[in-house]
UniProtKB/Swiss-Prot annotation:
It comes from Serratia proteamaculans (strain 568). It is an enzyme of class 2 (transferase). Its EC number is 2.7.1.167, 2.7.7.70. Catalyzes the ADP transfer from ATP to D-glycero-beta-D-manno-heptose 1-phosphate, yielding ADP-D-glycero-beta-D-manno-heptose. GO terms for molecular function: ATP binding; heptose 7-phosphate kinase activity; heptose-1-phosphate adenylyltransferase activity; phosphotransferase activity, alcohol group as acceptor. This is Bifunctional protein HldE.
Amino acid sequence: MKVTLPDFRRAGVLVVGDVMLDRYWYGPTSRISPEAPVPVVKVETIEERPGGAANVAMNIASLGANSRLVGLTGIDDAARALSAKLNEVNVRCDFVSVPTHPTITKLRVLSRNQQLIRLDFEEGFSNVDPQPLLERIQQALPQIGALVLSDYAKGALSQVQSMIQLARAAKVPVLIDPKGSDFERYRGATLLTPNLSEFEAVVGHCKDEAELVERGMKLVADFELSALLVTRSEHGMTLLQPGIAPLHLPTLAQEVFDVTGAGDTVIGVLAAALAAGNTLEESCFLANAAAGVVVGKLGTSTVSPIELENAVRGRAETGFGVMTEAQLKTAVAQARQRGEKVVMTNGIFDILHAGHVSYLANARKLGDRLIVAVNSDASTKRLKGETRPVNALENRMIVLGALEAVDWVVPFEEDTPQRLIADILPDLLVKGGDYKPEDIAGSTEVWANGGDVKVLNFEDGLSTTNIIKAIKDGRG
């Protein structure tokens, strides 16, 4: 399936559900408490992250879509922290404050990458009047292209049937990430997105794919669903619709570090794509690609449009790797049209080592795209002597282009890349070492164009010269 990423900026999505704040306390532990046989943790770092339905809303906003979040909170520090975090990532919060209840908060204490304890602060909102939530949905429906109901069984969706009916009456697709085995309450939804465990809790264990499809199609009919998307971890996803052949999407994950929040990413990307005008099949394809990205990250995370584009089309198809100057100018112009920040650096990069990789990764973090300009073989000889380079230009560029941090690699013949930098005019020019910014080739041109120049440190003790010397001395 060939899918083009939509303009997510024209998509409006409302997320309604159980919002919560995830708190993390990190610190070392080296002794046992004299008060009880428990470890003492010296808390050094505190992190706060939006969780539950709030994480779905963040995934939608990370794509550049208009993301609005409705949920129930208390009137407390947790609610204020949640709102502040979400505002930072352009999620519009429209919470219903309940003074008699605390904001749902999960506090985790960790030491040496091990979770020691989790403390939950919650009472549930099942007895809270749902009318304010229904009113907010009704008000938002004319401005949105999709409604997401994120159910964590904490009470925000106690009147889920009323919410479904409001959306269907307005002809707005309603997508639900279900909880529990009572799927009757989701009757009439446009799409349910259970994982395999949640699906089999309702229909029973499926011995093979054929049985999964058969039972899934029966579930679609029984609950009058328009579609069912079963997420199946390493087996990808299966989309089932009445009267249409099943669509099986194999996983695109290269590595799996953490599946936390992957379901939030799936439904968030799916809803944003639908709201932006993609078909359901195309939206599922994009959601599957996004899931492959997010499980390769540690902790609850989101996916950017750039990461999604790379996952869908591949680095070669999206104009990555080694380029001529003319090709680079075109790629940079397209990046700027997308609002991306272009970073540029340069060097010989003769024998690539850990210091280079770390430096390039840090440079890439400063923007959306990274250009690496590489000295030609002749230029390297003039600067380093007749014995250099060890590796020919073509090989150096191939290795650099294979790095995840590097988007574009371009050669230059001169001793410095000043002419090339003046042609490209990156938003940020980066150089490693102990340079003064004003001494960096191209800095004057970049500043004159309104850009910036930054110096990054190299890791001590790592250099191509030292590696070559070690090899000559027989220490390689």
